[in-house]
């Protein structure tokens, strides 16, 4: 099993605070039933981080957030 680290995700989203928000919102989407963008049997938080590290999810998550 490959380990996912925050450093891998920071290559895609350099700001730690934006990274945290994007991962949180994506994980919430996964919990609500949205389909994962990659095959993963991990928990939603880890899946969200894997998606960010691989470039499948990014800052567009912050644009979807209702204000």
Swiss-Prot record:
Pfam families: RNA_pol_Rpb6. SUPFAM superfamilies: RPB6/omega subunit-like. One of its GO terms (molecular function) is DNA binding. GO terms for cellular component: DNA-directed RNA polymerase complex. Keywords: DNA-directed RNA polymerase, Nucleotidyltransferase, Transcription, Transferase. Gene3D superfamilies: 3.90.940.10. GO terms for biological process: DNA-templated transcription. Its EC number is 2.7.7.6. The keyword Nucleotidyltransferase applies. The keyword Aminoacyl-tRNA synthetase does not apply. It catalyses: RNA(n) + a ribonucleoside 5'-triphosphate = RNA(n+1) + diphosphate. It is an enzyme of class 2 (transferase). The RNAP catalytic core consists of 2 alpha, 1 beta, 1 beta' and 1 omega subunit. When a sigma factor is associated with the core the holoenzyme is formed, which can initiate transcription. Belongs to the RNA polymerase subunit omega family. Promotes RNA polymerase assembly. Latches the N- and C-terminal regions of the beta' subunit thereby facilitating its interaction with the beta and alpha subunits. This is DNA-directed RNA polymerase subunit omega. The lineage of its organism: Bacteria, Pseudomonadati, Pseudomonadota, Betaproteobacteria, Burkholderiales. The gene is rpoZ.
